[in-house]
Amino acid sequence: VKMELDGGVASNSR
């Protein structure tokens, strides 16, 4: 969520 600005990679991890 915190790296959501990274391209949604962190969000995709969950």
Curated annotation (Swiss-Prot):
Family: Belongs to the CONSTANS family.
Protein name: Zinc finger protein CONSTANS-like protein
